[in-house]
């Protein structure tokens, strides 16, 4: 196993811990854990969480401008899921021109903090991913294994 910086855990310890977490997901009677994992772990949700973490409280359109490729419909759905799961807070401003802004909740901020090591790991290992893809593509050229 490659050195991950977690010297106190053996491979078996990591596997046992991973199994415990997976068992917790499996034992989720009402499906909330799995649903939150699916919502919070998808491309657009992570983008919203990152955007609100970096820029703070924003309007819907401002979030959309900072997230390349997201449609208005997908952004609306994503914000609703994140709000329902308690990761994002919606602020309604009843002014002369009413508007809505979104911000990370404390739980959303905690998710952002926990995602940074994964994003860092991905950035640090991008050359390994590229090399693996090149090797795989070379071996499987023209659909042949």
Regions inferred by a protein language model and the residue ranges of each:
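Solvent-exposed, amphipathic alpha-helical segments
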Residues: 47, 51, 87, 107, ...
